[in-house]
């Protein structure tokens, strides 16, 4: 019980503390040094190759896709990292992500349903990960108006209008199996009067 709680807390801390910086997804024609290096070589992206451990990447991808080259850039980076699970924030276009993931063999995806145009996506490697279920925490918390014109169900999570996305998955490498609850929290970066009150 304590080990499970420790794993759960570790995953929560990792997801909560992930960087929310902008994504350098406009590759342009060169790397800015004038040497026309392939922008998708990604020399600083590391595949740790840890076959006996769960590899999770969280990424505020910043309004995916931002540019015409975003899908190719992100796909190349994810393939280079070769992680088991990617928890992405600010998915502006589900269809673009679906197209990208469908071009990546052995990966699947799950989207949230309550975050609107800047939602969550869970992308995972089928070889190691089994998706069991998802839950959008506090998505049914009442609010005056959540902006969806459905006044019978004004259910806007009070924190930045983005309910945390909880996913229950099972990771297995054939030797060991780990059940994980992954919770993505998309913090609001900038305040205003209405958000500051919450």
Listing of model-derived features with the role each one plays in the protein:
Residues 3-11:
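Sec-dependent signal peptide recognition
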Residues 15-18:
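C-terminal motif of bacterial Sec signal peptides marking the signal peptidase cleavage site
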Residues 24-198:
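Divalent cation-coordinating acidic motifs and surrounding scaffolds
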């Amino acid at each position: 019980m304590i080990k499970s709680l420790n794993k759960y807390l570790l995953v929560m801390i990792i997801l909560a503390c992930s960087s929310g910086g902008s994504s350098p997804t406009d590759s342009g024609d060169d790397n800015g040094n004038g040497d026309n290096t392939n922008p998708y070589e990604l020399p600083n992206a590391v595949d740790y190759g840890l076959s006996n451990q769960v590899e999770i990447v969280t990424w505020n991808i910043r309004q995916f896709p931002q540019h015409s080259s975003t899908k190719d850039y992100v796909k190349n980076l994810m393939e280079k990292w070769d992680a088991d699970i990617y928890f992405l924030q600010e998915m502006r276009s589900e269809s673009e992500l679906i197209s990208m993931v469908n071009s990546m063999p052995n990966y699947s995806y799950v989207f949230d349903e309550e975050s609107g145009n800047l939602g969550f996506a869970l992308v995972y490697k089928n070889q190691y990960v089994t998706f069991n279920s998802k839950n959008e925490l506090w998505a049914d918390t009442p609010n005056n108006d959540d902006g969806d014109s459905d006044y019978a169900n004004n259910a806007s999570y009070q924190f930045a209008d983005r309910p945390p996305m909880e996913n229950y998955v099972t990771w297995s490498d054939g030797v060991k199996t780990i059940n994980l609850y992954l919770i993505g929290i998309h913090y609001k970066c900038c305040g205003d009067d209405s958000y500051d009150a919450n």
